[in-house]
């Protein structure tokens, strides 16, 4: 899977996201503080990663900032992107299952190495629900303007 990763800070957990995704066999394209010459600010770096998903150049994105909130807000401004700020495995599983999330937002402050691995395990194990009400909710997101 091709995954766009952004961070507004070159923090150890941001590097761990990249390393862990690569260890799992994914191709990583980095943005923001993780890519020399990129604008590092959370709004710009998260937008760049999210656009990769929206334009079909990446399958998913992981967007990071200190709290994860700004990165998730910026990513969700990109049409077609459904970013979920996840601080635990249960939220990551639910975001994939019920919301068909295609961008994972993470807090650089709160996410430890072991927690990151749990979140990624749940994220990649999760699959979008086939339930009619879940599909209807996700479809309705495209209608909201």
PLM feature segments, named:
Residues 17-19, 73-77, 117-118:
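Short amphipathic alpha-helical segments
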């Amino acid at each position: 899977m091709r995954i766009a990763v952004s961070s507004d800070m070159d923090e150890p957990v941001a590097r761990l996201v990249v390393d862990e995704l690569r260890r799992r066999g994914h191709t990583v394209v980095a943005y923001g503080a993780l890519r020399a010459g990129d604008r590092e600010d959370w709004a710009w770096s998260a937008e760049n990663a999210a656009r990769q998903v929206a334009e079909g150049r990446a399958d998913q994105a992981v967007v990071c900032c200190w709290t994860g909130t700004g990165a998730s807000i910026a990513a969700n401004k990109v049409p077609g992107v459904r970013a979920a700020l996840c601080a635990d495995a249960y939220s990551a599983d639910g975001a994939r299952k019920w919301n068909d999330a295609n961008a994972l937002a993470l807090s650089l402050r709160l996410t430890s190495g072991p927690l990151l691995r749990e979140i990624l395990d749940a994220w990649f194990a999760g699959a979008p629900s086939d339930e009619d009400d879940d599909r209807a909710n996700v479809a309705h997101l495209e209608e909201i303007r």
